[in-house]
């Protein structure tokens, strides 16, 4: 058990008791109520306790791609830099990148993430060791080639079976077709069938740039959401669509009708000059918005607090509307909405929810005065957290990983980058 004493929880000083991996009680809890031998007591004085953040779109092993290709357009970035480097990936490199990336997320308050990448056994190994929660998909790209399609579907299915057989509630599977401009109709149709068979979500890039939309229109005569909807891709499945930058009215209507989650990646979209997602229109149509960092190659970090702030600010400026996205909504994008998208019983601090939470020391200049906590967390906090509990276990204590040798991780990450870049 874990007992957090005297933290600011939902606006007032309270205690919180964790039993197993569940928040058992919130309120005034005496130490005499618990067994001292079986309970870890955490002093929450001067701290605010918040739900762990949820990153709904990333490529965690790409922590090693940080800074390798800045200030260029997406298609040049992909074909000229990222894809050539990815051709050199191996299990060792992906393991090192995932260790580095998951530590970065935990140290900035993220407790769960939604990933699409390769070498899933290496990702799973690192996730298991760091203690973070994850939804993982093998990234399928068939480039309209039948032989490659069969291989990709086989690997995706094997990955789902592997994750299923882990019997680890922290690690769940998903299906990750890359995008409509890199995947054939056949692989996309098979994705829907597999998602229903395994009862897992679909994670896909959608409408990130005008160029990719034009590619789909030229091939099919329809915009990407219209094209996928024409053969039932969104039917009877939970779909998380990353980016959603350039959307027509009909596409927004499809998202609304099919209960699609938008994974908004404001920093990555700005850095690659892809554009700005019409989040205000999504909200007006009751389309749930979540937040992602994308990979470090296009961000260049995985600090979701930066995405929360960006989401709160950008849409004010774009819409000339100071209440386009208010602080509470932006924070919900990164917590409550993400939990719904990934079907995780978290995202809020309530009794009966999973014990995935973060403690932040408020004795900092950028978090003072303490009366305005909600505003500070969105507009002034830098993301450096003190303690993180995931699945009822303390994984970060006083800013340091509990069960991971951080120096060793930095060492193997540097070695992996050297192998990748040379």
From Swiss-Prot:
Disulfide bonds: none annotated. This is 5'-deoxyadenosine deaminase. One of its GO terms (molecular function) is 5'-methylthioadenosine deaminase activity. GO terms for biological process: S-adenosylmethionine biosynthetic process. It comes from the Archaea. Gene3D superfamilies: Metal-dependent hydrolases, Urease, subunit C, domain 1. It catalyses: 5'-deoxyadenosine + H2O + H(+) = 5'-deoxyinosine + NH4(+); S-adenosyl-L-homocysteine + H2O + H(+) = S-inosyl-L-homocysteine + NH4(+); S-methyl-5'-thioadenosine + H2O + H(+) = S-methyl-5'-thioinosine + NH4(+); adenosine + H2O + H(+) = inosine + NH4(+). Belongs to the metallo-dependent hydrolases superfamily. MTA/SAH deaminase family. It is an enzyme of class 3 (hydrolase). Its cofactor is Zn(2+). Substrate binds at residues 86, 178, 208, 294. Pathway: Amino-acid biosynthesis; S-adenosyl-L-methionine biosynthesis. Catalyzes the deamination of three SAM-derived enzymatic products, namely 5'-deoxyadenosine, S-adenosyl-L-homocysteine, and 5'-methylthioadenosine, to produce the inosine analogs. Can also deaminate adenosine. The preferred substrate for this enzyme is 5'-deoxyadenosine, but all these substrates are efficiently deaminated. Likely functions in a S-adenosyl-L-methionine (SAM) recycling pathway from S-adenosyl-L-homocysteine (SAH) produced from SAM-dependent methylation reactions. Zn(2+) binds at residues 57, 59, 205, 294. CDD domains: ATZ_TRZ_like. Homotetramer. SAH is a product of SAM methyltransferases and is known to be a feedback inhibitor of these enzymes. As a result of this inhibition, organisms have evolved efficient enzymes to metabolize SAH via different pathways. The pathway found in methanogens differs from the canonical pathway, it uses the deamination of S-adenosyl-L-homocysteine to form S-inosyl-L-homocysteine for the regeneration of SAM from S-adenosyl-L-homocysteine. 5'-deoxyadenosine is a radical SAM enzyme reaction product which strongly inhibits radical SAM enzymes. Pfam families: Amidohydro_1.
């Amino acid at each position: 058990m874990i007992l957090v004493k005297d933290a600011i929880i939902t606006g007032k000083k309270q205690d919180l008791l964790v039993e197993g991996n569940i928040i058992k009680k919130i309120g005034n809890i005496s130490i005499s109520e618990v067994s001292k031998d079986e309970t870890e007591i955490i002093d929450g004085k001067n701290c605010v306790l918040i739900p762990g953040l949820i990153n709904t779109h990333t490529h965690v092993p790409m922590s090693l791609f940080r800074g390798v290709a800045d200030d260029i357009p997406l298609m040049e970035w992909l074909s000229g830099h990222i894809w050539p480097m990815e051709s050199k990936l191996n299990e060792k490199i992906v393991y090192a990148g995932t260790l580095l990336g998951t530590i970065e997320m935990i140290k900035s308050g993220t407790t769960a993430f939604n990933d699409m990448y390769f070498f899933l056994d290496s990702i799973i190994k690192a996730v298991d060791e760091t203690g973070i929660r994850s939804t993982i998909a093998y990234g399928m790209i068939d480039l309209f080639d039948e032989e490659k399609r069969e291989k990709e579907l086989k690997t995706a299915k094997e990955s789902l079976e592997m994750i299923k057989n882990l019997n680890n509630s922290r690690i769940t599977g998903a299906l990750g077709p890359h995008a409509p401009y890199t995947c054939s109709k056949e692989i996309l149709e098979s994705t829907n069938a597999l998602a229903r068979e395994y009862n897992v979500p679909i994670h896909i890039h959608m409408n990130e740039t005008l160029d990719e939309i034009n590619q789909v229109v030229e091939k099919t005569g329809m915009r990407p959401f219209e094209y996928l909807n024409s053969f039932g891709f969104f039917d009877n499945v939970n779909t998380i669509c990353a980016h959603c930058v350039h959307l027509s009215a009909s596409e927004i209507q499809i998202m609304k009708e099919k209960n699609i989650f938008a994974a908004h990646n404001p920093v990555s979209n700005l850095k690659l000059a892809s554009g700005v997602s019409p989040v205000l229109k999504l909200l007006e149509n009751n389309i749930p918005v979540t937040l992602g960092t994308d990979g470090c190659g296009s961000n260049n970090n995985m600090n979701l607090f930066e995405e929360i702030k960006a989401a709160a600010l950008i849409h004010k400026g774009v819409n000339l509307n100071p209440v386009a996205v208010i602080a509470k909504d932006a924070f919900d994008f990164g917590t409550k909405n993400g939990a719904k998208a990934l079907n995780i019983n978290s995202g809020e601090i309530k009794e009966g929810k999973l014990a995935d939470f973060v403690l932040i020391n408020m004795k900092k200049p950028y978090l003072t005065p303490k009366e305005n906590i909600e505003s500070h967390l969105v507009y002034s906090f830098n993301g450096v957290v003190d303690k993180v509990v995931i699945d009822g276990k303390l994984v970060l204590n006083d800013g340091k990983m509990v069960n991971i040798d951080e120096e060793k991780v930095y060492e193997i990450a540097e070695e992996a980058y050297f192998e990748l870049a040379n």
